From Swiss-Prot:
NCBIfam families: murG. It is an enzyme of class 2 (transferase). UDP-N-acetyl-alpha-D-glucosamine binds at T15, G16, G17, N127, R169, S197, I251, A270, L271, T272, V273, S274, E275, Q296. GO terms for molecular function: UDP-N-acetyl-D-glucosamine:N-acetylmuramoyl-L-alanyl-D-glutamyl-meso-2,6-diaminopimelyl-D-alanyl-D-alanine-diphosphoundecaprenol 4-beta-N-acetylglucosaminlytransferase activity; undecaprenyldiphospho-muramoylpentapeptide beta-N-acetylglucosaminyltransferase activity. One of its GO terms (biological process) is peptidoglycan biosynthetic process. It is found in: Cell inner membrane. Its EC number is 2.4.1.227. Its main location: membrane. GO terms for cellular component: plasma membrane. It comes from Dichelobacter nodosus (strain VCS1703A). This is UDP-N-acetylglucosamine--N-acetylmuramyl-(pentapeptide) pyrophosphoryl-undecaprenol N-acetylglucosamine transferase. Pathway: Cell wall biogenesis; peptidoglycan biosynthesis.
């Protein structure tokens, strides 16, 4: 196989939305014999998840620029210069065959270092709106891959790109079809609530309030993932309102969680939307209102357009509105219809397309 023995350096960090798609590609490449390295920040989300996956992790001193004010931007040239120097030394040591940037601030210095060293650079954009790092790297990358055509808006026309969709973990792609999963299901509607790796305040605090407004017999069976920092406060809110739910900080087995659910309430990060489409589930999305260029709303549009999902704006969302939305989703057969429509937006071939693009760059 072309990837056997090849050294691949992945760059992705900051949030699960960047790290998990990159891990899906890294695992698939490792199965084909590649040696996987990862460039990131030890204190970031990737610093924990990548070593857990068994891959070699290389730390560089870099942080995001957005939200750090004037001082952060003034320090940026020095921080980036140092990070590029660190990334360059790491690449000279490990000599990767291909460098793969999948978003997050660590990708920027790494991409620049790859260009300086003339190492093939591939970038992949998961969101419907291209992020700052990938928009800059698109001018020097050998290969540009996009999850959707919408993301091409920030790429100058002279830079060719391919639309591949988003890579999703294999265990999710292997889930039975919605009809098979729903066939013998009865009892209370099963609701999966996803607060994301960073936690979503609006979802975590409004959801228990909304459920408390419903009669006991209309309340779904809830599995609520809060993110670590919102766990205790969310548990307190449920207890104070005398609403029962299974509340967890993280879900390790997302395939199982999707398989057991009838529908989902979630933010609309690119990875979440892709996983829901691939699994086949009805969804109610509450996009993060401060996402750059409102990309989370755009991420959710495909599922909304095919009738698999609804989108509610956080700024106008109340417990009453959310309670009404939950109350209107009591018909499992209607949820099954939406679940089947969701699969029209799935990216089942994305992983193979990305691996093919990596192989093309291997010398």
């Amino acid at each position: 196989m072309i990837l056997k023995g090849k050294k691949l350096l992945f760059m992705a960090g900051g949030t699960g939305g960047h790290v998990y798609p990159a891990l899906a590609v890294a695992r698939a490449a490792a199965e084909q014999g590649s040696i996987i390295h990862w460039l990131g920040n030890q204190s970031g989300f990737e610093g924990k998840k990548v070593p857990e996956a068994g891959f070699i992790f290389h730390d560089i001193a870099v942080y995001g620029l957005r939200g750090n004010g004037v001082i952060g931007w003034l320090k940026a040239p020095f921080m980036i210069g140092r990070a590029v120097f660190q990334a360059k030394k790491i690449m000279q040591h490990i000599q990767p065959d291909v460098v793969i940037g999948m978003g997050g601030f660590a990708s920027g210095p790494g991409g620049i270092a790859a260009k300086i060293l003339n190492i093939p650079l591939l970038i992949h954009e998961q969101n419907a709106v291209m992020g700052l790092t990938n928009a800059l790297l698109s001018r020097v990358a050998n290969t540009i891959l996009l999850a959707s055509q919408q993301a091409a808006a920030k790429i100058a026309l002279k830079y060719p790109y391919r639309v591949t969709g988003n890579p999703v973990r294999e265990d999710i792609t292997l889930l039975p079809a919605p009809e098979e999963r729903f066939h013998y299901r009865s009892g209370r509607i099963r609701l999966l609530v996803l607060g994301g790796s960073q936690g979503a305040k609006a979802i975590n605090l409004l959801l228990p309030q909304a459920l408390s407004l419903l009669p006991e017999e209309q309340r779904p069976q809830v599995l609520h993932q809060t993110g670590a920092r919102w766990l205790e406060k969310t548990q307190t809110e449920y207890a104070a309102l005398n609403v029962h739910a299974e509340i967890v900080p993280f879900i390790d087995d997302m395939a199982k969680a999707y398989a057991n659910a009838d529908w989902v309430i979630a933010r609309s990060g690119a990875l979440t939307v892709s996983e829901i489409a691939t699994a086949g589930l009805a969804a109610l999305f509450i996009p993060f209102p401060y996402a750059v260029d409102d990309h989370q709303t755009m991420n959710a549009q495909c599922l909304a357009e095919v009738g698999a999902a609804a989108i509610l704006e956080e700024k106008t969302l109340t417990a009453d509105i959310l309670a009404t939305a939950i109350q209107s989703r009591q018909d499992r057969s209607a949820l099954l219809t939406q679940a089947e429509r969701a699969r029209l937006c799935s990216d089942e071939k994305a992983l193979g397309e990305i691996l093919r693009a990596i192989k093309e760059l291997c010398r």
